[in-house]
Every structure is written in structure tokens, then in C-alpha cells.
Regions:
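Histidine-centered nuclease catalytic patch
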Residues: 85-122
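Generic detector of ordered, mature protein regions
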Residues: 23, 44, 48-49, 105-113, ...
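Amphipathic alpha-helical interaction surfaces
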Residues: 76, 100-103, 135, 139
Length: 172
């Protein structure tokens, strides 16, 4: 199985999505999540080299591979890291620090016939995963940042939602 070719196939899917100006961000979520898994490889892939999913995780029930992958994500909150270290019953959330809807909007702004390498550069800049607790996810929801960026977002700070919610990044 050629993992690089699989990674590139998801960039091609995103390219077609952009060219068609399809506003359905659910497809972008699937394509971007899979692109990232094949880009990172290692614990982001299961033993069959398929992308690993991170839904319904509890800190006390993580496999070694899940734990390794979570610890390699772009952002892990102090509370999430503490829960992982203590193997508490805390529910963990894999979160796109810039919501996929916003990433989709950014990608759809690419007019014409974008190259896969340019799409990958945008994903490397804006596709960022966070590990937060269920309670921290509720904080984002309470301040209406569950699926959008803050009104004053500068277009660069990928962790702006977490900053607004007072979610602190752990030091690994």
C-alpha cells in the first residue's frame, strides 16, 4: 500500500471539491482528516494502514496507539493531558482548532485550478487538531465558538478559540 499516494489522493479530492465550489464542509472534513492521517502516519493509522478515528475517547480507556496519537496533535489542553496521565474517566474530544467549516471557506476562496501542493500548504497552515476535555468543549459551545472562529480572529492564530475560552495549552 502506497501511503504517500493515498495522502495525495485526498488532496486531489479536495482540489475537485474546490473546483466545483461545493459548499458541503462535511466532505472537506472527511478528506482533510484522511489526508492528515496519511501525512502523519504512525499512530494516526491502524495496523491495516487505515486512518484511526478518535471519537468517544475516555482517558482511562486509551490504547497505546491512541495515547501516542493524541500526544502528537497540535494542541493538548492542560486538563486533557492531566486526564491522560492520571488515566481518569474524563471524556476527551478531538477538536479541529479551526473549525472545518472555516477551513472549507478558506479552501473555497482558492479560485480556478489550485495545485495540490498549494492545497497542502493551506492545510499545513490551518488544519490543526486539539485534544480537549468534554468540559472544555462545553466552554467553547457556551461562548458560541463550537464551530466558528472569534469575531476578532486575525486569520493566523490557529488556537484563538481556545484562548477566548481560557483553555490553556499543556507543555509536553
Amino acid at each position: 500500500m502506497n501511503l504517500s499516494r493515498l495522502k495525495n489522493s485526498y488532496l486531489t479530492h479536495i482540489k475537485i471539491h474546490i473546483e466545483s465550489q461545493n459548499p458541503d464542509s462535511k466532505l472537506i472534513r472527511d478528506f482533510a482528516d484522511r489526508w492528515f492521517a496519511y501525512y502523519k502516519q504512525g499512530p494516526f493509522l491502524n495496523k491495516n494502514n487505515r486512518e484511526r478515528w478518535f471519537n468517544g475517547l475516555h482517558a482511562d480507556k486509551l490504547s497505546d496507539e491512541e495515547r501516542n496519537a493524541l500526544l502528537q496533535m497540535h494542541f493538548i489542553s492542560k486538563d486533557a493531558l492531566l486526564a491522560i496521565k492520571k488515566q481518569s474517566k474524563t471524556k476527551l474530544i478531538k477538536d479541529h482548532s479551526i473549525p472545518i467549516k472555516k477551513i472549507s471557506e478558506i479552501l473555497l476562496q482558492q479560485k480556478g485550478n489550485p495545485l495540490e501542493k498549494n492545497i497542502e500548504q493551506l492545510l499545513l497552515k490551518f488544519y490543526s487538531l486539539g485534544v480537549i476535555t468534554f468540559e472544555e468543549d462545553l466552554k467553547l459551545n457556551q461562548i458560541k465558538l463550537k464551530s466558528r472562529m472569534p469575531e476578532d480572529w486575525d486569520g493566523d492564530a490557529v488556537f484563538a478559540r481556545y484562548d477566548k475560552a481560557g483553555i490553556k495549552k499543556a507543555k509536553l
